[in-house]
Amino acid sequence: MEIFTDDWVDAKEMNYKYPDTFDYPTQIELDNIAIGDSIKISNGLERFWVEVKEKNKIYLIGRVDNELITNEYKLNDLVMFENKNIYDIRTKEDKQFYFKKLLNSQKLKKRK
């Protein structure tokens, strides 16, 4: 399977220039990224989520986890990026919490 690279936005630099608009995780959060976590990156056209599939000291590889509008790559494609490109992190535990919350809200709607 092809692994895409792109001219990813440097989220750390953008956070320095525009702290109210661009988030950047702490070093501890970056160090604790695990396989299965969701990471938000951007190619300058849109920000999107990828699920981490591989991680080493130099780069990460993730699977695109949402539909994209403007890119040559699409849902489920693999992309390679660095820590400096990460805007946000959702851990596996975060995702499970939000999923359970969504399921519970759907159950409540069905009862009404």
Residue ranges and their predicted role:
Residues 1-9, 13-16, 71-110:
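Intrinsically disordered, low-complexity, charged/polar segments
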Residues 6, 29, 35, 54-55:
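Central antiparallel beta-sheet cores of small beta-barrel/beta-sandwich binding domains
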Residues 16-27:
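Charged, amphipathic alpha-helical segments
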Residues 27-46:
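Short coil-to-beta transition motif at edge beta-strands of beta-rich domains
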Residues 46-57:
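Short beta-strand-centered aromatic/proline hotspots
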Residues 57-58, 84:
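Beta-strand-connecting loop/turn residues
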Residues 58-66:
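Short, solvent-exposed secondary-structure boundary/capping segments
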